[in-house]
């Protein structure tokens, strides 16, 4: 998969197939809300394992019952690449 940054048009096209995800700065982000902290923690753990398998690691933020997943490609100059859209799709499949 390419480390080249995506264009704005490519990002918007990818987001049309990624409900709930947003392009924020140079990242893709989505936040999930759970019943409680333990459910958010379990979801974060699952995303962590998925990220490790793909060797593309998302930033995870837990705020009690909310999990925010944020991804960018460091080797693409901290820009959004196909690695990010692919990871976003996989995370959505995992958590929804």
Q: What kind of region is each of these model predictions?
A:
Residues 2-34:
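N-terminal first-folded block
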Residues 20-23, 48-58, 96:
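Short arginine-rich
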Residues 38-44:
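Short amphipathic alpha-helices within nucleic acid-binding modules
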Residues 51-72:
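Mid-chain, well-packed structural core segment of small domains
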Residues 68-96:
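C-terminal structural segments of small proteins and small subunits
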């Amino acid at each position: 998969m390419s480390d080249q940054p995506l264009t704005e048009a490519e990002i918007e096209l990818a987001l049309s197939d990624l409900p709930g995800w947003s392009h924020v700065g140079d990242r893709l982000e989505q936040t999930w809300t759970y019943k409680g902290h333990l459910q958010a923690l379990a979801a974060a753990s699952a995303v962590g394992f998925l990220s490790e398998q793909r060797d593309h690691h998302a930033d995870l933020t837990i705020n009690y019952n909310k999990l925010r997943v944020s991804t960018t490609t460091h080797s693409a100059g901290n820009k959004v690449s196909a690695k990010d859209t692919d990871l976003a799709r996989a995370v959505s499949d995992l958590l929804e």
